[in-house]
C-alpha cells in the first residue's frame, strides 16, 4: 500500500496510457469481422482465439461450423483467419484465384533452408520447384519405384508374421511407422534402413527428431501470436527445426551426390537421383533453373515430413476401421485375392486398379484427414463472393469439418466405403473432399502416397486378418494435439489367413 500511495498522479496517468496502448495493440485487428457482419468466437487481446485450439483443432472447427455456418472469423493472435466451408468460395481460393491471390501458404516462423521446400516456397520460386519436381511423380516414375517399395512390404509381412506367432496384439503405429520410415528414406535418399530391427540407426534417430512437433511448443506459439518475431529469430539463427538433424541431412546429400557421380549409381531410381539429374542437366544450369544442393536437401527433407506421419497414421486408421468392420475387411480381401490369385506378387497396375481398395482408402481419408485444415495467404486486397479479405489475412478451409458435414455426407460418422463407389463418386463435390487439397497447390506427392498405402494394404491383407482385442479403443477417440491422432495407440490382433505367408 505504501508503494501505491507513493505513486504520483502523473505516474498513474502514464500507467493507464500504457495499458490502453497495449490493449489497443493487442486488439488492433479484432474489429475486421465485426465490420462485415461475419460471426465467430470472441477474441482475447494478443491471443485472439488461439486458446480454443486446446480442445483440438478438429473439434473446434466442427463446433464453429455447426454454430456459425459457412463462414466465420478467427484470430491467431493478431492474424485474421477467414474460415470458409462454402464450396464456391473454396473453389475460388484453391483454383480460380490461386495464382493471382492465394498462391502461398502461411509462414510459421523461422524455418531456415526449409523455406526452399516446395510446400513452403512462395510465388515464382514455388512454381519453379513444382515444375522441376512434377515429372518425378508421373505414373512412369512411380512404376519404376514400385519394386523398391515392394521390398519393404515384404519386410512388413515378415515382421507381422513373427508378431502373429507370439499371439500378442500389435501396435499399428509402430509397424506402419517403421514401414513408412523405410519407404521414405529409401525413395528420398536411396538409403536402405530396416528401422523395425535397427531403431538406433543414425538416419532413423535424426529423422524421428526432425518429425517431433508440438502445437504448443513455445517457439511455435510465439511466432503464431507475434509474427514480427520471425525475422528477429532468423537474425539470431534460431530455427523451428533441430539444427543437428538439418546438418546431418545436408552432409548426407552432399556425400550421396559425390558417390553417385559414377555411371553405375546414377541410374538408381529415387527422388534424390531424379533431382540430381535435373541439377546436372546442362540446359537447366544455363537457365538457372536447376536445383542447388541446398534446394535438393530441402525437398528431400520435406518428402520425409509429407511421407512419414500421414502414411503411418492413415494405414493405422484403415486397419482399425477394417478390424471393427469385418464384413468390409472380408470384401476387400476377396477383391485382392481375385486380382492376385494364389498370393501373386502385386504389380503397380493391379494395385492401382482395385476399386474396393480405393473406396476403403478414400473413406478412411474422409474420416481422418491427417492435416485437419488447408490454408492460403491473401497476397492482396480482394473480394470473394461479397466478402472483403485484406492483404495478409489467411483463408482457412477446415477439411475435417467438411468431411464430417451431414449436409454433404449422410451419417458422416459411419465408415461406409460405398460412398466412393463408381456410382456415387461422381456426385461428390470435389471441394468437400480435400485429403490432399485441390488446385495447382495440392499435394505434389498424392499419387506416390496412394500407391505406397495401397501396396502396404495389399501385402498385409493378402496374408493377415485384423481383429479387435481388449486393448483396442472402440469407438476411436481423437487427440487434441497437433495432427490427427488417436488418444491411445491403435492396437489390434493379427491373425494369419493361412500357413502360406508371401514375402516371408
Curated annotation (Swiss-Prot):
GO cellular component terms given for this protein: endoplasmic reticulum membrane
Catalysed reaction, written as an equation: an organic molecule + reduced [NADPH--hemoprotein reductase] + O2 = an alcohol + oxidized [NADPH--hemoprotein reductase] + H2O + H(+)
The keyword GTP-binding is assigned to this record: no
Membrane topology: Peripheral membrane protein
Keyword annotations from UniProtKB, A to Z: Endoplasmic reticulum, Heme, Iron, Membrane, Metal-binding, Microsome, Monooxygenase, Oxidoreductase
Manganese as UniProt keyword: no
Ranges that cross the membrane: none
Cofactor(s), by name: heme
Principal cellular location given in the protein's record: endoplasmic reticulum
Role description: Cytochromes P450 are a group of heme-thiolate monooxygenases. In liver microsomes, this enzyme is involved in an NADPH-dependent electron transport pathway. It oxidizes a variety of structurally unrelated compounds, including steroids, fatty acids, and xenobiotics.
Homology family: Belongs to the cytochrome P450 family.
Name of the protein this chain belongs to: Cytochrome P450 3A1
Gene that encodes it: Cyp3a1
Amino acid at each position: 500500500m505504501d508503494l501505491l500511495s507513493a505513486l504520483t498522479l502523473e505516474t498513474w496517468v502514464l500507467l493507464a496510457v500504457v495499458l490502453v496502448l497495449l490493449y489497443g495493440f493487442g486488439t488492433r485487428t479484432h474489429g475486421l469481422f465485426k465490420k462485415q457482419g461475419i460471426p465467430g468466437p470472441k477474441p482475447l487481446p494478443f491471443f485472439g482465439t488461439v486458446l480454443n485450439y486446446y480442445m483440438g483443432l478438429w473439434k473446434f472447427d466442427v463446433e464453429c461450423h455447426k454454430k456459425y455456418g459457412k463462414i466465420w472469423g478467427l484470430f491467431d493472435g493478431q492474424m485474421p483467419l477467414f474460415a470458409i466451408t462454402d464450396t464456391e468460395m473454396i473453389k475460388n481460393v484453391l483454383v480460380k484465384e490461386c495464382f493471382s491471390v492465394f498462391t502461398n501458404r502461411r509462414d510459421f516462423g523461422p524455418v531456415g533452408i526449409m523455406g526452399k521446400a516446395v510446400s513452403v516456397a512462395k510465388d515464382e520460386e514455388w512454381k519453379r520447384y513444382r515444375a522441376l519436381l512434377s515429372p518425378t511423380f508421373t505414373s512412369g516414375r512411380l512404376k519404376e519405384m514400385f519394386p523398391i517399395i515392394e521390398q519393404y512390404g515384404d519386410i512388413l509381412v515378415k515382421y507381422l508374421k513373427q508378431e502373429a506367432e507370439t499371439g500378442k496384439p500389435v501396435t499399428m503405429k509402430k509397424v506402419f511407422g517403421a514401414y513408412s520410415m523405410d519407404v521414405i528414406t529409401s525413395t528420398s535418399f536411396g538409403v536402405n534402413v530396416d528401422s523395425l530391427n535397427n531403431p538406433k540407426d543414425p538416419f532413423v534417430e535424426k529423422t524421428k527428431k526432425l518429425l517431433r512437433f508440438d502445437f504448443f511448443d513455445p517457439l511455435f506459439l510465439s511466432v503464431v501470436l507475434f509474427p514480427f518475431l520471425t525475422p528477429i529469430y532468423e537474425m539470431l539463427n534460431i530455427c523451428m527445426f533441430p539444427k543437428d538433424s538439418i546438418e546431418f541431412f545436408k552432409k548426407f546429400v552432399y556425400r550421396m551426390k559425390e558417390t553417385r557421380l559414377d555411371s553405375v549409381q546414377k541410374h538408381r531410381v529415387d527422388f534424390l537421383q531424379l533431382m540430381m539429374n535435373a541439377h546436372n542437366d546442362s540446359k537447366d544450369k544455363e537457365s538457372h533453373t536447376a536445383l542447388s544442393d541446398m534446394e535438393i536437401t530441402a525437398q528431400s527433407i520435406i518428402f520425409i515430413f509429407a511421407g512419414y506421419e500421414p502414411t503411418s497414421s492413415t494405414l493405422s486408421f484403415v486397419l482399425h476401421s477394417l478390424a471393427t468392420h469385418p464384413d468390409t475387411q472380408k470384401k476387400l480381401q476377396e477383391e485382392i485375392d481375385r486380382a492376385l490369385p494364389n498370393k501373386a506378387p502385386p504389380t503397380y497396375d493391379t494395385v492401382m486398379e482395385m476399386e474396393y481398395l480405393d473406396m476403403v482408402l478414400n473413406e478412411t481419408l474422409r474420416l481422418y484427414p491427417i492435416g485437419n485444415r488447408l490454408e492460403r495467404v491473401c497476397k492482396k486486397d480482394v473480394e470473394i463472393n461479397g466478402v472483403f479479405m485484406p492483404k495478409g489475412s489467411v483463408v482457412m478451409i477446415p477439411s475435417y469439418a467438411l468431411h464430417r458435414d451431414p449436409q454433404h455426407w449422410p451419417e458422416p460418422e459411419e465408415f461406409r466405403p460405398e460412398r466412393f463407389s463408381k456410382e456415387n463418386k461422381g456426385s461428390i463435390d470435389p471441394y468437400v473432399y480435400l485429403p490432399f487439397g485441390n488446385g495447382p497447390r495440392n499435394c505434389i506427392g498424392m499419387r506416390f502416397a496412394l500407391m505406397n498405402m495401397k501396396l502396404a494394404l495389399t501385402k498385409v491383407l493378402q496374408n493377415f486378418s485384423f481383429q479387435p482385442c481388449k486393448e483396442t479403443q472402440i469407438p476411436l477417440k481423437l487427440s487434441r494435439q497437433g495432427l490427427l491422432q488417436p488418444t491411445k495407440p491403435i492396437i489390434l490382433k493379427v491373425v494369419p489367413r493361412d500357413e502360406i505367408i508371401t514375402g516371408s
